Amino acid sequence: MHGQPHQHLHTSPTAPFNMTIPYQPSTYYGCSNVTESYKPLGKIGEGTFGEVFRAEQITTKRHVALKKILLHSEKEGFPVTALREIRILKLLRHENVIPLVDLAVERGDQSKKERGCVYMVTPYMDHDLAGLLGNQSVQLSPAHIKCYMLQLLEGIGYLHAKKFLHRDIKAANILVNDQGILKLADFGLARGYDGPAPNSQTAGVNTENLTAMVVTRWYRPPELILGDRKYTTAIDMWGIGCVFGEFFTRKPIFPGASDVDQGSKIFQAVGVPTEDTMPGWSVLPGAQNSNIWGTDATNKLDKLFGRLSKDGLDFLKGLLLLDPTKRLTAIGGKNHAYFKTEPLPCQPHELPKWQSSHELDNHKRREQEKNESKVQPPPREKQPPVREPRDRDRSRDSRPPRERDSRDRRPPRGRYDSFERPERRPEGPRDGPRDRDRDEYPRELPPRDLPPRDLPPRDRDYPPRERDWDRRPPPRDRDYPPRERDYPPRDSRDRDYHPRDRDYPPRDSRDYPRDSRDSRDSRPISPSRERFHKRPQFDMYSDTDYDRERDEDDRRRRPLPRDSSRDMTRDVYVPSRGREPRELPKGPPPAPGDKVEDKGESHNKDDKPCDTENPRDSDKSRDLGPPPGPPLPADGPPPPPSSNPPRPSETYGGSRPPWRRDSRDRRESRDRDGRDRDGRDRRLSSSRYARDEFDEYGRKRPRIER
């Protein structure tokens, strides 16, 4: 090191890097191995904290107590309560506080998945106060009680002077040895607090919020019952008051089943809290249960502890005050007049020695007494079954039983769920030799004598007698358990597995239209439902053009019946009856400048308006072809209109596009040949038609002027 001469160190050759180093378990300094240092002698206590064993230290031959610390979860590690208890016990040194002698470690076995555990080693104490008070052979005098109470106040006063709260004062945590020394134990809930230490008048001040779920319920003070979190050392003094009262009752004085019941038992003894007896109690969270506890604020401790002296009763009332600020402290309790009156407290060595008594021993003793109190009745002699006399011919019983068939089977599970399950056959005699296949049913009658049965003569009618009702009728030839409907089950039939027509509702009760029903159902529709099935009859060869302005018929948005044999993109309107529609050109649209065959449309090659009235006389209309309709003669007037002229829908020239049609097309379609009276093409004479022209490919034509 710096400033010191270098010491000569023994060096060894450097080991290779891949050299395997043997495993050496780490050592715990300050801890011993429990299997090497201690010999277990038996269990003396158990609880949520762990288990306590009595053991003998091998080196010193003295008896110690091993408190096993339970490791509930490997993820959580060592319990915080155990660490707090070890730290506090290391800081305390007092005759009336249990010391921590050692920490022992038991290694686990990874191959067997056994965890290691830690033991806290403390001196062995022969008794705990709960075991002494539960042992009826232990009789305590007032001097003995005062001696124990003084030692208890000394220990708790030292703890409070060090600014620690025990928070679990109860009879089971107060230990006593054969020398009469009392020691406080179990500091798992103890913790320090900030604030001034208590004196002879006040219990100190605490400004920090602490957990309220502390102290065993039977020893819990009223401020914790009401949910106060800024409690002081007064909670330990309430527990000492409960222990003092337990000296005389030999059992807990407030054994509540719940927090509310605990409050009820406390307030029944010391009175319901008021602003005078417990200032500020109404603002605590637990004050909402005040309607359960009543309104009686009378202190009844003098009636419950009538055998106590006046000073003893005053000392008990001072420890069990509702107001924690006025409750006796450890210093004030030691100076109380109760310890200065006769009989005076004895010295610890003057206390008698009793047999070792712990709380666990009391539990074992009570279980043993409970088992001994249960006297087992002598076993009853098994009586032979009593057969009922039979009046019928005994020769029938000699017949062999018939073969079992389907009638002997129970109904299969799940088949008769809608009916009640058959009940078991009632107890009673069976059919003698034929009943050997029913041993699962009891066949014994109650062990009593049957009354004699006097049958009246057949020729006289006697009223029934009560003793005749006590007798069962003679059994039938074959008894069956009560069944429902068709049991025994019938043989399988096809109709049991196939639906029947009568299981379904009538077909006419369906709510969908008649057209969607089965075609085999040819029954007529009722008049009341006729309007729901009424629909227009469409004929693809009749003139049934749809008109938006036709209000006399109900408007149904139904499409035309589709004909799969027709090209739906070819035309839109239904052709007229008796005439085949004109075929339209197929393939891609012609390019500009190509020669286009005339399909009834009037246009020229260059897409320019015509100069003459008749487009056939123009040179620029040489590619238009003949006009639609019958051919015109070379010379002479045009022929009269045909009796069956082409419809405007065939040429697309006599009407507007299908998506822009209206009633005007109906008015103008009366001249169905598509020409004017003088024979001119109406598509060229009417600017309205020329303005809205579309070719067969859906393209809008240029505007043609006369």
Curated annotation (Swiss-Prot):
Signal peptide: none annotated. Residues 360-523, 545-570, 594-623, 659-706 have a biased composition (Basic and acidic residues). Disulfide bonds: none annotated. The active site is at 168 (proton acceptor). GO terms for biological process: positive regulation of transcription elongation by RNA polymerase II. Residues 625-648 have a biased composition (Pro residues). It is found in: Nucleus. Its EC number is 2.7.11.22, 2.7.11.23. ATP binds at residues 44-52, 67. Residues 360-706 are annotated as: Disordered. This is Serine/threonine-protein kinase BUR1. It comes from Yarrowia lipolytica (strain CLIB 122 / E 150). The gene is BUR1.
